[in-house]
């Protein structure tokens, strides 16, 4: 298992770093949990979709199965933007054949004890919930 995440990273940053990581590690499975920071910065859902799709395709071309962990934004970003953002993850999964967890924080988001003070990042208490969300989609890829 290689954790190549960088705190605060966007899909553009992940895409820029992906090729050398694929070359170095030759993963069998790639889990992409990117996009939240794109959304929190108000970046274009169109660009998010393009970047995420490119990351999935590059990973698949390198021989990896891909799991996308979808995200959602707080409602203060407006209905139109949050809807467009949330639609990116299932669209990319459908277009690329990647596996999908629609919302990785399902059951934890909005629960104060399961989220850090920023309301964005999960706590240690939330990890069993995240496992329940991710494992059914991840297990078939292993």
Where do the PLM segments sit?
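A short beta-strand-loop structural module common to alpha/beta enzyme folds
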Residues: 1-10
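Alpha-helical cap/lid subdomain in secreted, periplasmic
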Residues: 13-142
